[in-house]
Amino acid sequence: NFSCPPDWYAYD
């Protein structure tokens, strides 16, 4: 999910 604090940072 894309939130204000990035949830995707762990997914390089």
Curated annotation (Swiss-Prot):
One of its GO terms (molecular function) is toxin activity. Its main location: secreted. It comes from the Eukaryota. Residues 11-12 form the C-type lectin domain. The keyword Disulfide bond applies. GO terms for biological process: venom-mediated platelet aggregation. One of its GO terms (cellular component) is other organism cell membrane. Keywords: Disulfide bond, Hemostasis impairing toxin, Platelet aggregation activating toxin, Secreted, Toxin. The complex may be glycosylated. Expressed by the venom gland. The keyword GTP-binding does not apply. It is found in: Secreted. Belongs to the snaclec family. Trimer of 3 heterodimers of alpha and beta subunits; disulfide-linked. May not activate platelet via the integrin alpha-2/beta-1, since antibodies against this integrin have no effect. Potent platelet activator that aggregates platelets via both GPIb (GP1BA/GP1BB) and GPVI (GP6). Alboluxin induces a tyrosine phosphorylation profile in platelets that resembles those produced by collagen and convulxin, involving the time dependent tyrosine phosphorylation of Fc receptor gamma chain (FCGR1A), phospholipase Cgamma2 (PLCG2), LAT and p72SYK. This is Snaclec alboluxin subunit beta. It comes from Trimeresurus albolabris (White-lipped pit viper).
